[in-house]
Amino acid sequence: MALQDVCKWQSPDTQGPSPHLPRAGGWAVPRGCDPQTFLQIHGPRLAHGTTTLAFRFRHGVIAAADTRSSCGSYVACPASCKVIPVHQHLLGTTSGTSADCATWYRVLQRELRLRELREGQLPSVASAAKLLSAMMSQYRGLDLCVATALCGWDRSGPELFYVYSDGTRLQGDIFSVGSGSPYAYGVLDRGYRYDMSTQEAYALARCAVAHATHRDAYSGGSVDLFHVRESGWEHVSRSDACVLYVELQKLLEPEPEEDASHAHPEPATAHRAAEDRELSVGPGEVTPGDSRMPAGTETV
């Protein structure tokens, strides 16, 4: 019996289209083809988007993100959490494929816990970033999509690293990842200072994500705000992005302009003052200091 008879490659194809794909064109995978490879070549191109950001300042590291999970034009979840705790002093933002991000963060949590048990202390943020970069770089070219910002506090203070699935690892003060990152960078570059207060940092992060969700079609929902301190990470708030943007616009509205005559009064000159004095005094009257007043005359 031939192999093609065992595999039934010559039999009529009775496989129906997948219920999870559009029916136009009949998305049935041919016999003998790898489904993943076939769909990568012939499948629909689905757009993904998000807005995540993180920045470092003197009181710790701020991480913020929107909560909309989308697949093309379909909003899969309007209230997902895109900031994942790794351990007590380490957070990570997620951008890319949700399944890949969740899987690799579980792997990172496991590896860091094993190192903590072996060494008796938590690894540094730089060690965690290097470990994640090394593990994901082995799968380069296999359609892995993970872009994350690791925010933590270790023995050297607040630290921030960006790690991508191809093995890229960068250290910096400001990172924003996702389709809404150009809009978030515009707000961050204008208002960021390393010596800002905690409330100023909260307001800056909320403002950046809110503006990005307003301009980016694939970002939305709410704004999650996290703060990593020396004592550990803290979930500060979750605010509705639309309401937050409206409140920010009200704060930026210009004050009503005053009347032009009051806003720009005519400058007083010596000639103008003399004319006003002549108008206020009658033609036959004499004012103090006038040259027509006789010498030695006192005014009452």
From Swiss-Prot:
GO terms for molecular function: endopeptidase activity; peptidase activity; threonine-type endopeptidase activity. Keywords: Cytoplasm, Hydrolase, Nucleus, Protease, Proteasome, Threonine protease, Zymogen. Residues 1-49 form a propeptide. One of its GO terms (cellular component) is proteasome core complex, beta-subunit complex. It is found in: Cytoplasm; Nucleus. One of its GO terms (biological process) is CD8-positive, alpha-beta T cell differentiation. It comes from the Eukaryota. The keyword Hydrolase applies. It holds the Pfam family Proteasome. PROSITE patterns: PROTEASOME_BETA_1, PROTEASOME_BETA_2. The active site is at T50 (nucleophile). Disulfide bonds: none annotated. It is an enzyme of class 3 (hydrolase). It catalyses: Cleavage of peptide bonds with very broad specificity. Gene3D superfamilies: Glutamine Phosphoribosylpyrophosphate, subunit 1, domain 1. Its EC number is 3.4.25.1. The keyword Nucleus applies. Residues 1-23, 255-300 are annotated as: Disordered. The proteasome is a multicatalytic proteinase complex which is characterized by its ability to cleave peptides with Arg, Phe, Tyr, Leu, and Glu adjacent to the leaving group at neutral or slightly basic pH. The proteasome has an ATP-dependent proteolytic activity. Incorporated instead of PSMB5 or PSMB8, this unit reduces the chymotrypsin-like activity of the proteasome. Plays a pivotal role in development of CD8-positive T cells. The 26S proteasome consists of a 20S proteasome core and two 19S regulatory subunits. The 20S proteasome core is composed of 28 subunits that are arranged in four stacked rings, resulting in a barrel-shaped structure. The two end rings are each formed by seven alpha subunits, and the two central rings are each formed by seven beta subunits. The catalytic chamber with the active sites is on the inside of the barrel. Incorporated instead of PSMB5 and PSMB8. Belongs to the peptidase T1B family. This is Proteasome subunit beta type-11.
